[in-house]
Amino acid sequence: MGITISNHKKSIDMGYGGFLNLRATISTLVPCQEFVDIYRELNDGYYTEWKKRGFKTREEYFEDYDNRVEEICVRNKLDEEVVNFLYRSDCVTKSLSPKACRHLWWLIKDYDDNVLYGYCGRPDCAKFKDFKEIVRTCAKDRRVMRFS
């Protein structure tokens, strides 16, 4: 069970961990170190960060976290489409609009790595370049990117 990311020409498969890593990589491309740091905190916060920061419950921590993210995004005029992509639930997200794909493309177009985000051992294991190709095609052809 995992996620298939597709458009009208191509699809890639990855597990939830691969999708988490993909979005974590994309978050490092956002031109605001404060955002990069708080996004990284998300993974830590889910398990222990709330205790370290003196919150009594995870709910209190995440309410504070959401407020800090919103304040950082507004103050730094971060791209709402990209931020929404990074924070969307991977369980309920079904598509990304062509507009959001264009915004995402401008952020990721000059980046590449050799990390395997898909299922290792498969001949078609998804890499960042495969994700970029899907995003670029959606942006160029004005098509929706789908998640299933």
Language model regions located:
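Acidic (Asp/Glu-rich) sequence patches and key acidic residues
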Residues: 1-148
